[in-house]
C-alpha cells in the first residue's frame, strides 16, 4: 500500500490516491475525491487477515488514519525492515531498495506533482503503480535478511509499535522520542 497526498502534513494536505497491490504484478489505484467515504478501502485496511505492506508505513498510516478514520493493521514496513537488516548502509529509500535488492530502477520524477488533479496523467499513474508493485518482493528479500541476522522479532516489535507512533504523530508529538532521557 502507498498513498499520494498534496503534501506532507496530514491535517493540511488531503489524501488523493491510494495504491494497492497483491504482489501479483498488478496495482489497483483508488483516486479519492473530497469527502469520499471509500467503504471498501476502509474494510480492507481494517481486515485483520490481510497483511498491509508499506514503505515508510509511519506516514501512510497517519494519512489513512486521519483521512479515513482507519488504522491499517496488521502492517509490515520495508523501510523499518531495511534499517534493521541492512545496517551496512544508510540508503533505505524505496528507489534504493528496488535497485539494490531487485535490480529495478524506479523513477521518482512524478513524486511531487498535483495528485489532486481531476485527471491524473499516465506518468503519474505509472509512478503511483511502481511504488507498490515491488513491495512484496522487497519484503521477501528483507525478511530473509532479518532471519539471517536474527532480527525478525525486533522488526515485528517495531511494526507492533507503529500504531502508537502514528497516534503520537497525529496528536502533535511527531518529534517526541518517548524513550529519550
Feature names for model-found ranges:
Residues 1-181:
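DEDD superfamily 3′-5′ metal-dependent exonuclease/proofreading module
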Amino acid at each position: 500500500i502507498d498513498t499520494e497526498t498534496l503534501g506532507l502534513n496530514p491535517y493540511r494536505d488531503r489524501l488523493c490516491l491510494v495504491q494497492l497491490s497483491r504482489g501479483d504484478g498488478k496495482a489497483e489505484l483508488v483516486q479519492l475525491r473530497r469527502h469520499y467515504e471509500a467503504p471498501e478501502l476502509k474494510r480492507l485496511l481494517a481486515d485483520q487477515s490481510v497483511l498491509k505492506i508499506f514503505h515508510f508505513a509511519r506516514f501512510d498510516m497517519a494519512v489513512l488514519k486521519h483521512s479515513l478514520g482507519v488504522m491499517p493493521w496488521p502492517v509490515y514496513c520495508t523501510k523499518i525492515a531495511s534499517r534493521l537488516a541492512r545496517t551496512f548502509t544508510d540508503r533505505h529509500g524505496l528507489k534504493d531498495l528496488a535497485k539494490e535488492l531487485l535490480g529495478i530502477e524506479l523513477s521518482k520524477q512524478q513524486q511531487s506533482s498535483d495528485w489532486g488533479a481531476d485527471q491524473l496523467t499516465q506518468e503519474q499513474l505509472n509512478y503511483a503503480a511502481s511504488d507498490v508493485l515491488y513491495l512484496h518482493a522487497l519484503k521477501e528479500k528483507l525478511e530473509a535478511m532479518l532471519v539471517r541476522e536474527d532480527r525478525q522479532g525486533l522488526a515485528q516489535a517495531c511494526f507492533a509499535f507503529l500504531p502508537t507512533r502514528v497516534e503520537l504523530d497525529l496528536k502533535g508529538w511527531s518529534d517526541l522520542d518517548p524513550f529519550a532521557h
